[in-house]
Amino acid sequence: MHLTGLFLYPVKSFRGCAVATAAIDALGLVGDRRFLVVDENGAHLTQRPLPRMALISTELTATALLLRADGAGEISVPLRATAPAPLRTVSIWRSHGLVAEDCGRAVSAWLSAFLGVPCHLVRIGEKFRRPVLDRPAFAAAGTHAPVVDDRVVSSDLFNFADGYPFLVVSEASLAHLNDRLVSIGEEPVPMDRFRPSLVVSGCPAFAEDTWSRVRIGAITFRSGGPCARCSVTTTDQFSGERGHEPLRTLATYRRDPTDPTRIHFALNLTHETKSGTLRVGDAVEWL
């Protein structure tokens, strides 16, 4: 097995970018989801209620985050504060009281105008700390293999992702789904619908469901359980248009047998190796 795709999402819910190599630090991939859009109360905003977020592209330079959107032009945001930045208390799902740096009025106005809602961009700074939280055990969809989060430790930290710093999926799993879609007259969907960090090849479809630990290159990961999917998978990541697929088809065969409200595709991961580098082409080994 090999790593065939490596993706960064500099701002949560904005368009991601493929990279050939990426460094790893305590929070995950360097440059991945270090920025977040929040409302006036500090609650995170995502494509779920705001599919227009998919229309904003991201680019990282050595010193700045560049945001672009058709009709709105481009705006640049420093990766690090050049002076003490105002702090905002923000929340993401079960993570409350997170301290982040406000990125300023200019980008707030730019985003608010484009998205049509008052909002602010915040950045991970020195005071940010977000531990990976324990979750209940879930069965892998289509199997009864338990995936238990009983090894979460205090050093397991992460960024502004939903629940875990990494998401892995196999090319074979997407191919299996697309075969089903085509067989019922639907269009195949690209990998970007699932916003993975890591894409692997050389294993059967849904083999990742059963991985408890995996090594990619020199980096070892621990399973955080299957990823429950939402309406973001039905959102075209370039047009922002939303349909019914692939979630409707996934619901026919990828429901969690212990909780049918959860529809699984891809596997959450926590990195046990807290520094290093991942490269497309790295060997992948199930441990």
Predicted regions located by residue number:
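Metal-cofactor-dependent catalytic cores
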Residues: M1-L287
